[in-house]
Each structure stands twice: as structure tokens, then as C-alpha cells.
Amino acid sequence: MKIGIVLYPTFGGSGIVATELGKALSRKGHEIHFITYSQPVRLDKLRENIYFHEVRISDYPLFDYTPYEQVLTSKLVDVVRYEKLDLLHVHYAIPHASAAYMAQQILNSQGIKIPFITTLHGTDITLVGKDPSFEPVITFSINKSNSVTAVSKSLKEDTIKQFDIKTNIEVIPNFICFEEYQLSNNEKYKKRLAPNNELIITHVSNFRKVKRIEDVVTVFKNISKKLKAKLIMVGDGPERNKIEKLCREYLDHSSFTFLGNLKSTIEVLNISDVFILPSEKESFGL
């Protein structure tokens, strides 16, 4: 099949899952077309059966904000028509599902049939979806999807509770390739981050308030009173500066390290003794 995958190309979970899914499908012989505004961070190289179509965003003096949904819709119409796609798979309800529906209707008027699947990932429902101004669009685009999936049972239940959903939602959990995480020679990397053989405690997130990263610092502070430990912070986001300041204020300067965004977390998770994720809410926890 020729499949178009629409995603956010950033370090967030939905973009990573969408990228890895596309790569896996390409290995099975499907032709995958990623459609987004920049190359996905986990798409390190274009390989056989994988193509990337950039949604170019221009600044128009008339608009205070770039109308990304309309630009994306036009790009979807173009790629479906030119590449003769069989299916669109959109990850994250806003604005991808509504853009896919608009593209579907435009193509339908030209005699081209293109179904689309919407996958719900979490914050598109639990956070963004709570804004009443988005509710009609989210409800409409989910109901108009040819198929809808959610990454967990709890997310499915939240979606049904918050929106007037008339269509079936199938739960398809996120996935991980265990073989990729079986690293044998990681002592050198561990020695660099924990030279005194400290217990390594790791947090990975997009540093938003919902991740409750202040609690990570509090927990680590208590642990470090009794054990030799090292706190590894992976990721970036709006709360990072605040959390860094907190660490400098309450922790020994040699007991924590901020690594920023990593394209792959395989190495750091392999050397970690504890992974801590005290989120207020997670659609797909561990």
C-alpha cells in the first residue's frame, strides 16, 4: 500500500510512535510518505520506501497566525493526487484529523477516494480537548474518520466521556522493539555519567507541567540523602529553566545532569537503574 502519515515531527511521543510505525511498515514493503512541516526527528535517514513531503509555512501580512491547517490540507490533496496514495494515517486530532477530512472532501469532488485513520495519543484529548473552542472540531473530525484508534483503554474512555463520539474507537497500544534496547557494552557510557558508580535515576519528558518534574527533584533529593545517586534529565520544554534552577538550588551540583533532547534514549535507559515518570496524567504510561 501507499500510505501517507501525518504527524508532529518533534520529540513528543506521538511523533516518535508515528515515525517508528512508518519505518516498520516500510520494512514490510509498504510505501510510506511522511507529511509534516519538518523532517521528523526519528527519521534520521530516508531509506527505501520512505518519502518526506514538507508542508511549507509562509508568512502572510494579512494573517496574525499562519493558517497551518489550510496549508496542510492543500499539501495532503497534492500528495494524495500525485503519489496516488491508498490511505492517510493522521496522528493527533488537532489539526491533522480535520485537515484530512477537508482534503478527503476536496479529493472526493475530483473523483478520488481516500480513507483516513485518526490515532489519538493523549494530550490532544485530555488537555487540548478540554478547551471548549476546540470541542466541535475534535468531535466532528473524529466522527468523520474512517477509522479511529487510541493508544490506551483509558484514553478511549476519556474521549467517549468528553466528546459526543458516534464511531467505534479501537485500542492499539504503543509498541517498543526490545531487541534495540539490548546493549551489551555500555559501561563506558555509564562511567561518563556516573563516574563513582552512583545509582542512576532518569527522567525523560517534554518538560511540561503535566509531567510534575518538581516531584522528580523532590524524590531525588530524598533518595540522595541515603544513597549515592545521579539524576539524569532528558528532554526539553517550557519547564526546563525552572527545573534547572530548582536543581541548582536544592541539589549538589555534581549529582544531576541535563542532557536536553536526544534522538534516541536507548543508551541512557540502558544504563539507568530507575526510570521515574510521576505525571499528573498519561494516556500511555509504563
Show which residues each predicted segment covers:
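An amphipathic, basic-hydrophobic alpha-helix
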Residues: 62-88, 97-98, 102, 132-136, ...
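Short acidic alpha-helix that forms the nucleotide-activated donor recognition element
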Residues: 241, 263-272
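Aromatic "clamp/platform" in nucleotide-sugar-dependent glycosyltransferases that forms part
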Residues: 261, 280
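Carbohydrate-associated surface elements
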Residues: 154, 175
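Nucleotide-sugar donor phosphate/pyrophosphate-binding loop at the beta->alpha transition
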Residues: 108-117, 123-141, 157
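N-terminal strand-loop element at the rim of the active site
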Residues: 7-11, 23-68, 169
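A short helix/loop element that forms part of the nucleotide-sugar donor recognition site in Leloir-type
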Residues: 181-195
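Conserved donor-binding/catalytic core segment of Leloir-type glycosyltransferases
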Residues: 149, 195-211, 217-220, 232
